[in-house]
Amino acid sequence: MTTATPSPANPLTGRTVVVTGVSRRAGIGHAIACRAADLGASLLCHHFSPHDAEQPWGADSVEATLDSVRAHLVPGARLVDVEADFRDPAAPPAVIDEAVRALGGVDALVCNQASSGRDGGLEQIDAADLDHH
């Protein structure tokens, strides 16, 4: 975290936002990260492109996705990215630890990641399926 003073145009200046699921330019995570950057935030963008590669829409270029987010950063804001598979119980705390190490802390967390494509109907979903998300 920085000591920069937020302005009405950039109310997230000096804040760090972690956004999970920033792996493709057509995704919600990308849109959220771009908007947070527009508002002055420094960002840790999490992605896991192997998941998208398994989907019918396919994977996007992670670097192109991150470059697109970088284009929204205001002067002084920074972007850090981490690839992590949240099926590994050690991954979520490691992502937060990296935000603290690289950006000084976490002011907001947007949990956008999800597992797609294997749920079936609502009547078939059980607790294990929900935990997988």
Protein language model features and the residues they cover:
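Canonical Rossmann dinucleotide-binding motif of NAD(H)/NADP(H)-dependent dehydrogenases/reductases
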Residues: 4-50
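Conserved catalytic-site loops of classical short-chain dehydrogenases/reductases
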Residues: 16, 107-108, 131
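Glycine-rich phosphate-binding loop and adjoining beta1-alpha1-beta2 segment
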Residues: 47-68
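The beta1-alpha1 cofactor-binding region of Rossmann-like NAD(H)/NADP(H)-dependent oxidoreductases
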Residues: 60, 82-95, 127
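A short helix-to-beta-strand connector/capping loop
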Residues: 67-80
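Glycine-rich phosphate-binding loop signature in dinucleotide/nucleotide-binding domains
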Residues: 99-104
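Conserved NAD(P)H cofactor-binding loop of Rossmann-fold oxidoreductase domains
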Residues: 112-118
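Substrate-binding pocket helix/loop in short-chain dehydrogenase/reductase
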Residues: 120-122, 126-133
